């Protein structure tokens, strides 16, 4: 008998992220650009201040102590002409007007000299600013180069390569301290993950042998036609329990292996993988009265065929087992969407609360509360599927279907 799912332990996460990318990315430049702007801006401000001081000092110098050394007192027979100061022409000018014209002409020449000084200084400042920004960009790149090395190592670690280290050389500064701390963290993580995977792998291997022996002994006793009915019934029950334990061991071993990055990749068609999964659950679907349908288009990915087949088999098996007997259906579709291969498994079934969807991917977590019911499986199927999808650089998501059931979607890079 199905029970009412427990209420959620925490409210759903908000869909809006206040740290989402701004519509104007240039408003949030990289740290290298910001350092370049800082270096170049400081040089530009210093240059402007220096130019202003030089201009003011030059203006004061040309305006102070530069009075004419002579004064014309009589120009009866003097003829003066100037191409740079046309107003200096004694024809028709009085003596005082002529002296005033000479003073105005000198003021004009001083102004022209200051304007030339300012324009040429601005051009020189502009050229030096360009050089300063280029030099600042190069220096910022050199200063930040250790961060690039740290980033590349972190990306390699994100790909499940915990053996990578930064090993930064150089002076004992803040960046080297950061790199050394990061290396120490990677060392501890590698030891922890290695110990975990070794334990799971060894435990699974050690449990395989006695389970296989138990299965063989039970099958031999069940094949005896003279065995009592009670003994045969007990043997079938023990055989089913043993099979469940074998599935658990295989699931744990596969879960431990699938957390690693896939090294050897080969072309795998998701349509073919889905077809094989459907063939394996065909008898179970027929016995339960569940229709399996869908359109499967070619969707070739690079990966491990056995692990990808396990994803499809787990999803299709769950879709058949957790369905409506006699009138349910399962739809399996594959396609290539937006440059990615997609496997979608949709099924009818009981209503799944939205807050329970994330729990489906946790090991040994199922919607039913009983642990010894008639359901097959051990609660590792979706955990394995998620681990395998991540190992292939993809992801798997689940959504409740309106009216009951789930929509499982696996997305893998082509």
UniProtKB/Swiss-Prot annotation:
It holds the Pfam family HATPase_c. CDD domains: HAMP, HATPase, HisKA. It comes from Streptomyces coelicolor (strain ATCC BAA-471 / A3(2) / M145). The keyword DNA-binding does not apply. SMART domains: HAMP, HATPase_c, HisKA. This is Sensor protein CutS. Residues 142-194 form the HAMP domain. The modification Phosphohistidine is found at residue 205. Residues 1-15 have a biased composition (Pro residues). It is a multi-pass membrane protein. Keywords: ATP-binding, Cell membrane, Kinase, Membrane, Nucleotide-binding, Phosphoprotein, Transferase, Transmembrane, Transmembrane helix, Two-component regulatory system. Gene3D superfamilies: 1.10.287.130, 6.10.340.10, Histidine kinase-like ATPase, C-terminal domain. Member of the two-component regulatory system CutS/CutR, involved in the regulation of copper metabolism. It catalyses: ATP + protein L-histidine = ADP + protein N-phospho-L-histidine. Residues 1-21 are annotated as: Disordered. Its EC number is 2.7.13.3. It is found in: Cell membrane. Disulfide bonds: none annotated. GO terms for cellular component: plasma membrane. The lineage of its organism: Bacteria, Bacillati, Actinomycetota, Actinomycetes, Kitasatosporales. Residues 202-414 form the Histidine kinase domain.
